[in-house]
From Swiss-Prot:
Family: Belongs to the methyltransferase superfamily. PrmA family.
Class of this enzyme: transferase
Protein name (Swiss-Prot/TrEMBL): Ribosomal protein L11 methyltransferase
GO CC field: cytosol
Organism: Pseudomonas savastanoi pv. phaseolicola (strain 1448A / Race 6) (Pseudomonas syringae pv. phaseolicola (strain 1448A / Race 6))
Subcellular location: Cytoplasm
Amino acid sequence: MPWLQVRLAISPEQAETYEDALLEVGAVSVTFMDAEDQPIFEPELNTTPLWTHTHLLALFEADTNAEMALAHLSLLTGEELPEHSAEVIEDQDWERSWMDNFQPMCFGKRLWIVPSWHAAPQPDAVNLLLDPGLAFGTGTHPTTALCLEWLDGQDLKGCNVLDFGCGSGILAIAALLLGAEQAVGTDIDVQALEASRDNAGRNKIAAERFPLYLPEDLPHQQADVLVANILAGPLVSLAPQLASLVRTGGRLALSGILAEQGEEVAAAYADSFDLDPIANRDGWVRITGRRR
């Protein structure tokens, strides 16, 4: 079924007003989009940032009178409408379109991330079946790729791994499939823990090999390998805690770090770890090292 799509160019200050007004005049969905490919990194706590130049897309039933809807919108907001357009678009199978764009990916020499609905390109490889589900972590982001490639290059046989900020569970599950004895996952988001649990089951990982915790419930036990793909700010503030969770001689991999933040994060760990050269990809970095 076709839809009427209305696009408006707004400022962040106008976002809430126009979202409410569009729903009031009959929009069935409202979506915010970046108008200038401007990234948002590490917002302040308790904020929901928008881009400096934002496009607001609203979908209406196809038989909606666009002129009347826009006139009503102007009345509700009490101001002249910003730059806008309206067009009828054909319906799409959005889920199928998204699934078609998520293809198997290889990381390092052994490891493949394979969508759960896709056949493994190399059945004899280490294939991690993944449904991105409710949380981040599919391998498409440079930070996830950097961590997966690092794990693929490690001898993990018999190791205990801690995935701090586990998201979809992709790093912990990869470690288990690559030979780790056990992986512990922790995340502040209960939905992330649920996604990790689902993805572990999809890969036939027994629950006792992949226990999951909220941070406040995480047992204090040292790991042979710790991976944390989160953000630079938390990595710096959590440095003493994360260092204490790695045994002497254990290995560390950190990412979620912008290139310009790399030296600051590395400095926070330099007293506890012998650090490797920083790895860089597409403006993001990975920091690795061994516990003294």
